[in-house]
Amino acid sequence: MPSHTRARAVAIARDAKAAMDASTRARAATPRRAAGRARAATPRRRASGRATARGDAEATARTREDGDAGDARFSFRRHEACVRTTLRARCGEGLEEARVDDAFAARANAKRGVTTTTEAWSSRRLRRVRSTYVDGGEKAQIYNCAVYPACEACDAPVFGVDLICVGVGAARKILIGVDLQPMSRDRDYNDAYVPKLLKLRDGGALSACAEALNATTPSKKFYEDATYFSRGMFFARPALANEETMARSLDVVRAYLDVWLDRLDEAEREAEAMDGACKFGLSLEDVRRCVLTEASAREAQDAHDAWQLEHDPAIAMFASWYGEEWARDFAETVLFPGARG
């Protein structure tokens, strides 16, 4: 990894960790008498980290079923439920749950008050869906999801969601990132959907959301070597962790997911038409030529994972919570398995 890229990744993780630590210290400053009464009112029961994580994972599953549980406080649970429900309704044929090792499916750090849960699955239309949620109460709410289309839909991009809220008070940082991540820099590839995103975000149906969420252009310093981000990416830094931010960001996720599903439909039809024309010797004049082949689409998705493995600042954050070995194994086997080829 280039030194400037590593420095930025470490800086982001350090900022998030500092925000978490600040809120932890603030809680520690609570009068001891009140804290003592709270402890006395709580049954004394010890649980291992794995048992605690498993219990949190079961609670998470219940939350996913109703989609609204826990939304009395700021969270991205509704976003998680929306993506999961929509994908399973539109792309669930032939669904297979992917096995995620128990050590990675749920992990808790009781001292930090943070639990991380992950699920993964595939279907006929989707090569892989990986959804990760970090629940640290008021100190951390993070939802990250990556949806890889089946490689037969050669020119379909990867749908990515990255929603982050860490820290409390003045130390709180919120970031909203949603994109249809290109697997090729080819102009024809990007022209098939990026203009739709730009129209949607800049003066279209999401213009009010963009204003309310403080949408901005990602820093060139941070994204100068960003191979897998489109010009239509929705990137925002909301000032407040409130109901409006939850609702507006959910509107963004829904709208971008709709564009992605439409593009997936188109990419599948284009690939089928091109394949049929080639098989039967028909003219390709009226068929949009796919930029990628099934094989090159697979290679591009795997290259995406390899790039993310070296650049994603969340790995450093996970290392601060669960240790470097766990974080690296989690990144290589669960977050970005395509990096292994």
Predicted regions and their residues:
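Phosphate/adenylate-binding glycine loop and adjacent helical scaffold
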Residues: L126, Y133-I176
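Mixed-charge (acidic/basic) macromolecular-recognition segments
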Residues: K173-Q301, Q308
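Amphipathic alpha-helical packing elements
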Residues: D286-R340
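Short Lys/Arg-enriched alpha/beta "domain-start" segment
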Residues: A61-Y143
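Short secondary-structure junctions and interdomain/linker hinges
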Residues: W260-A267, A271, E325-R328, P337-G341
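N-terminal chloroplast transit peptides
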Residues: M1-E65, A89
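Generic recognition of cysteine residues
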Residues: C82, C91, C145, C151-C154, ...
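Intrinsic-disorder-associated interaction segments
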Residues: T5-A9, A72, F76, E80, ...
